Amino acid sequence: MSANYIEVQIFGQVLRLHCPPDQQENLLASAQRLEERVALLKDQSGIIQLEKVLAIVALNLNYELEQEKQKNANNKAVLESCIHQLDNSLSKLLSGSSVAINQESV
């Protein structure tokens, strides 16, 4: 098997996927978590059709991803606001220092 491909077994099916060597461990862990989520949903819901369970898990994962994107956007906005406030404070502080220095030299 090429170093750029990895075989992953999901629900009894072997998938051969292109994957950089430094990301193979994460891909295997992701496949394991996917199997766990599907098994949990099947147990909790009683749904036995794999296609339905996969669709629900995919929808849940996408929803969680969108929530994380929104959190990241909110965090970015807060950080940008803090940086702007710090920049303004620093500018005021530095402009006040230059005025004080100019007055001392007069």
Swiss-Prot record:
Belongs to the ZapA family. Type 1 subfamily. This is Cell division protein ZapA. Keywords: Cell cycle, Cell division, Coiled coil, Cytoplasm, Septation. Activator of cell division through the inhibition of FtsZ GTPase activity, therefore promoting FtsZ assembly into bundles of protofilaments necessary for the formation of the division Z ring. It is recruited early at mid-cell but it is not essential for cell division. One of its GO terms (biological process) is FtsZ-dependent cytokinesis. Its main location: cytoplasm. It comes from Actinobacillus pleuropneumoniae serotype 5b (strain L20). Homodimer. Interacts with FtsZ. One of its GO terms (cellular component) is cytosol. It is found in: Cytoplasm. The gene is zapA. Residues 22-81 form a coiled coil.
